[in-house]
Amino acid sequence: MSEETTVRPERTERSERPERPQYRGNGPRKRRPFQRRKVCRFCADKDLVIDYKDPRVLRSFITERGKIVPRRISGNCSKHQREITEAIKRARNIALIPIASTHVVA
């Protein structure tokens, strides 16, 4: 077999390259609004207790469709999010809160 060598064009320095636009979208660039750091309400208020028998508190951590709100949205710390999840599951098991709030027709 004969070995062929391919000749690559020389790379240009970065300063010689044409500048690319930083934003490659179609419309104007949108800035994200400033979002405050979410604080776990259970860490902030030590008197507030997670109890599976209190559906009023648990409903604020459930969506309209009956799903548990994730930690990044609710702002809970991991310890309290686990406790809330466990309390919601217990309350669902004994029918204090519905598993799905309404029947969803696809």
Curated annotation (Swiss-Prot):
Protein name, UniProt field? Small ribosomal subunit protein bS18
Family listed: Belongs to the bacterial ribosomal protein bS18 family.
To which species is this protein native? Answer: Geobacter metallireducens (strain ATCC 53774 / DSM 7210 / GS-15)
Supply the PANTHER family for this chain.
30S RIBOSOMAL PROTEIN S18 (PTHR13479), SMALL RIBOSOMAL SUBUNIT PROTEIN BS18M (PTHR13479:SF40)
The question of whether Disulfide bond is a record keyword is answered with no
Q: Which Pfam families match?
A: Ribosomal_S18
Q: Which InterPro entries match?
A: Ribosomal_bS18, Ribosomal_bS18_CS, Ribosomal_bS18_sf
Keyword Ribosomal protein set for record: yes
Q: Name one GO biological process term.
A: translation
List the SUPFAM superfamilies hit by this protein, alphabetically.
Answer: Ribosomal protein S18 (SSF46911)
**GO MF, any single term:** structural constituent of ribosome
Cellular component GO terms, alphabetical: cytosolic small ribosomal subunit
- Residue stretches spanning the membrane: none
Query: What quaternary structure, including any partners, is listed in this protein's UniProt entry?
Result: Part of the 30S ribosomal subunit. Forms a tight heterodimer with protein bS6.
Regions of compositional bias (Basic and acidic residues) in chain numbering: 1-22
Q: What is the lineage of its organism?
A: Bacteria, Pseudomonadati, Thermodesulfobacteriota, Desulfuromonadia, Geobacterales
Keyword vocabulary terms for this entry? Ribonucleoprotein, Ribosomal protein, RNA-binding, rRNA-binding
Region of interest called Disordered, as start-end residue ranges on this chain:
1-34
Task: Provide the function of this protein.
Answer: Binds as a heterodimer with protein bS6 to the central domain of the 16S rRNA, where it helps stabilize the platform of the 30S subunit.
List where this protein forms a coiled coil. Answer: none
